[in-house]
């Protein structure tokens, strides 16, 4: 759901309430997190301000509004939804009218495939008598390849997207970006791309829907024990105390954060689930009122110090900070490069009101103009949440539309020589919706493009000339941000907190239970979705606001999405330079990173 700060400002002005730009951005973030429209959010906010007797909008008022109104409404909604779900199956079975309507929809869909179109817009069909030859496909331009009439007879270009005036605007900058030409060498440079896996990367599909609850518990327990062992050694802790053993002196406990109910985690519902070795998986409620600074989310592995005088409740007084992994050390051959330009973009590649791929075609033009050494393209390429996909208005199979996208990008960027890396998304409607997600398969990849095109899994560890990239298309910031609770004595940046959690939990998806959109296979998750090292560059696309930040020496970028609702979005670009001699403060061979986020 795209949120407009301009519309928020207009709604506020109706009530005579002015707002600073920073607060508008915060309000837009709340709209996304709590899935509220601009009008609904402003109405709730005005009602809150009126009842509280506030005449101006401040950061403190927004924080109180989120805590007292939005959080409570979300908890109530989750509680009522859980009650409704108990009886949903029975209603589905006994509702004959719904079955009749479903059959009518299927017949309508079948007629859309079987009834030939009439008039000048008749589509070319491929039959055994008149096959569509490869030559006729390869000679078409990118615009012809992605002609929307080939898979949606009612497709029209987005008016808001085509009328945008801020294309090419740089919206945020990181590092010494001044003087950088932002143009690469395309295929003329020496580029080394290696997918790193420990012990090996995910390269093919696997059987799903076979996991049992004990298998999930085993993975979570192993994660607690592994992280606990690392933190125990780092902080020189002699031993952990079992959760349920009463003690009069301070104790140190190891466990995983959980919630005592089915609702959202809050300061009164925190529980600690112990490890198997010391606590046999027991649970204990946690009182966090004595902690001045904390940030917690379900699934987080923590070490807590406090008092457990009864063996039934822990009063926490100290929370040990997590420790990130060391950085990747490149070989002499990998580290021998001068500079590399990397472009990163994340789907959707269509606007919400149109199935035309104009934003993708504009991105191809940018690639051909700037000639980056490597282009990393994240899904979704055909978004499962697109209105025309949800309403079954496309007349071509999803797989065919996706292949047209791939063919357009590969052939359209051939002249630039740029290396292409494709990362799938759980929102790719044609692909396997399981996490970790295997790479795309494209058997029709031309031989001349095989050296410069690479399909990787979601998530993925990719070494580009010895610079380790962490890649994921999952919206970690949104998922963890919606579940996190925090208390801070000073100013605290939510994005930085979440990124620190990911790096110190050493996992691409440390949240448990996962978000409702996630179908996780935990056996493969334990093998393929862990961070083997702290990446030099971490790409975390999100619906939330774009940024580039330095977290523990790792450059973390949210390039935004290429489209935001009906308007254009943003993409990112990075300029990497490694000094031939010397090391930085993190013990790495000197690496300099400049980055920008740019509007399409």
Swiss-Prot record:
It is found in: Nucleus. GO terms for biological process: DNA replication; DNA replication initiation; DNA replication, synthesis of primer; protein import into nucleus. It comes from the Eukaryota. The modification Phosphoserine is found at residues 126, 141, 147, 152, 154. The keyword Nucleus applies. Residues 141-158 have a biased composition (Low complexity). Phosphorylated in a cell cycle-dependent manner, in G2/M phase. The modification Phosphothreonine is found at residues 127, 130. Residues 112-167 are annotated as: Disordered. Keywords: DNA replication, Nucleus, Phosphoprotein. InterPro entries: DNA_pol_a/d/e_bsu, DNA_pol_alpha_B_N_sf, DNA_pol_alpha_bsu, DPOA2_OB, Pol_alpha_B_N. Pfam families: DNA_pol_E_B (PF04042), DPOA2_OB (PF22062), Pol_alpha_B_N (PF08418). Belongs to the DNA polymerase alpha subunit B family. Component of the alpha DNA polymerase complex (also known as the alpha DNA polymerase-primase complex) consisting of four subunits: the catalytic subunit POLA1, the regulatory subunit POLA2, and the primase complex subunits PRIM1 and PRIM2 respectively. Within the complex, POLA1 directly interacts with PRIM2. PANTHER family: DNA POLYMERASE 2 ALPHA 70 KDA SUBUNIT (PTHR23061), DNA POLYMERASE ALPHA SUBUNIT B (PTHR23061:SF12). Accessory subunit of the DNA polymerase alpha complex (also known as the alpha DNA polymerase-primase complex) which plays an essential role in the initiation of DNA synthesis. During the S phase of the cell cycle, the DNA polymerase alpha complex (composed of a catalytic subunit POLA1, an accessory subunit POLA2 and two primase subunits, the catalytic subunit PRIM1 and the regulatory subunit PRIM2) is recruited to DNA at the replicative forks via direct interactions with MCM10 and WDHD1. This is DNA polymerase alpha subunit B. It comes from Rattus norvegicus.
């Amino acid at each position: 759901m795209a949120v407009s700060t301009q519309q928020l400002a207009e709604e506020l002005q109706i009530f005579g309430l002015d707002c600073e730009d920073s607060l508008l951005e915060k309000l837009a973030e709340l709209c996304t997190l709590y899935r509220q429209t601009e009008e609904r959010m402003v109405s709730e906010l005005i009602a809150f301000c009126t009842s509280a007797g506030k005449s101006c909008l401040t950061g403190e008022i927004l924080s109180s509004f989120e805590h007292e109104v939005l959080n409570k409404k979300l908890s109530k909604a989750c509680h009522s939804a859980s009650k409704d779900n108990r009886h949903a199956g029975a209603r589905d079975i006994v509702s004959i009218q719904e079955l009749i309507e479903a059959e009518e929809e299927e017949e309508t869909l079948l007629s859309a495939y079987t009834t030939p179109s009439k008039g000048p817009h008749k589509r070319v069909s491929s039959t055994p008598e008149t096959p569509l030859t490869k030559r006729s496909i390869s000679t078409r331009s990118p615009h012809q390849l992605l002609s929307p009439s080939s898979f949606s007879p009612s497709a029209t270009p987005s008016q808001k997207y085509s009328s945008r005036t801020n294309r090419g605007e740089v919206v945020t900058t990181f590092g010494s970006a001044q003087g950088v030409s932002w143009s690469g060498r395309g295929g003329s440079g020496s580029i080394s791309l290696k997918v790193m896996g420990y012990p090996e990367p995910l390269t093919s599909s696997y059987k799903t829907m076979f996991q049992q609850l004990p298998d999930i518990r085993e993975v979570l327990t192993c994660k607690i024990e592994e992280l606990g062992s690392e933190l125990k050694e780092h902080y020189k802790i002699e031993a952990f105390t079992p959760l349920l053993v009463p003690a009069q002196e301070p104790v140190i406990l190891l466990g995983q954060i959980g919630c005592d109910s089915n609702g959202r985690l809050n300061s009164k519902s925190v529980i600690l689930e112990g490890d198997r070795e010391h606590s046999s998986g027991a649970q204990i409620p946690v009182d966090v009122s004595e902690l001045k600074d904390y940030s917690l989310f379900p699934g987080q592995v923590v070490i807590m110090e406090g008092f457990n005088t009864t063996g039934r409740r822990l009063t926490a007084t100290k929370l040990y900070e997590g420790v990130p992994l060391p950085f990747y050390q490149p070989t002499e051959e990998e580290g021998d490069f001068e500079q590399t330009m990397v472009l990163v973009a994340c789907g959707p590649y269509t606007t919400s009101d149109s199935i035309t791929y104009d934003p993708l075609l504009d991105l191809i033009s940018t690639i051909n103009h700037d000639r980056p050494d490597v282009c990393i393209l994240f899904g979704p390429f055909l978004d499962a949440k697109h209105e025309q996909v949800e309403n079954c208005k496309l007349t071509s199979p999803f797989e065919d539309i996706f292949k047209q996208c791939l063919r357009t990008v590969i052939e359209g960027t051939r002249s630039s020589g740029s290396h292409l890396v494709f990362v799938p998304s759980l929102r790719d409607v044609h692909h396997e919706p399981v996490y970790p997600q295997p790479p795309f398969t494209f058997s029709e990849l031309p031989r001349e493009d095989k050296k410069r095109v690479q399909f990787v899994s979601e998530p993925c560890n990719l070494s580009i000339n010895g610079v380790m990239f962490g890649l994921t298309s999952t919206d970690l910031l949104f998922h963890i941000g919606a579940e996190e609770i925090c208390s801070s004595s000073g100013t605290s940046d939510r994005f930085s907190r979440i990124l620190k959690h990911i790096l110190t939990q050493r996992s691409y998806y440390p949240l448990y239970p996962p978000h409702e959109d996630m179908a996780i296979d935990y056996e493969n998750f334990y093998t393929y979705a862990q961070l083997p090292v702290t990446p030099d560059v971490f790409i975390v696309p999100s619906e939330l606001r774009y940024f580039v930040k330095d977290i523990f020496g790792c450059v973390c970028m949210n390039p935004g999405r290429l489209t935001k609702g009906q308007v254009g979005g943003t993409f990112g670009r990075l300029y990497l330079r490694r000094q031939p001699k010397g090391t930085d403060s993190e013990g790495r061979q000197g690496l300099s990173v400049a980055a920008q986020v740019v509007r399409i």
